[in-house]
Amino acid sequence: MASRAKPKPPPVDPESLLRATKEPDFRQERSRRSYLALIEAATLLFSSHGYDAVGTPEIAQRAGVSVGTFYRYFDDKHEVYLEICRRNMIAAYRETIEGLGPERFAGRARHETIRETIAVLFEHVLQNPQLSRSFTEMSLRDPQVAELRRAFEAVSTQRLTLLISAIVPRDVVPDPEATAYVIYGSAMQCAYGLAGHVGAPPIDAARAKTALADFIERALFPIR
């Protein structure tokens, strides 16, 4: 008799996935400090040496706590890596896209809004290029990291789609969702290129920021 196929689990909401932090509900400030010290230590080590070369003893030593303390909060280094990845993506979303409302694109303000948002995005990626490169590499071989990256892309694109729909007439941008996807992809790929993910970039960050901002502004607000 053939066995029944297991039902697929319901899809996880991308925003819920990104915000599903593993941080415990601390009752003592000392415990909270130890937890955050482990996060910081792991971030530094993964940035410097990559995922494979780092072990839990090194993370605990760098954080100034025992290995037993590490396992009090995390099952293994993979779990702390996922938490770092999640925190980084949430921070990027909050610092760039989450606060963008239609009112910030009224008249000449849109010019500065676009440039400021690009500057913040580039700063976020370039302040720790090794870590962002690690996230990219891991997303190609780790399903959970890939899932987080897809969730970040989905949430960002959804937000941009709503924004474009609100500020740009449909006769100018007939497909807000596709346009949002292209703008998101262009901005992220440009930032990753400047971070050296595929070698030294051929142009500097200032020129790239200006060109990307002009490209986005022309796409959304063409001179008619």
Kindly give the residue locations of the regions a language model identified:
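Hydrophobic alpha-helical bundle segments that form small-molecule/ligand-binding pockets
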Residues: 102-107, 127, 142-143, 153-180, ...
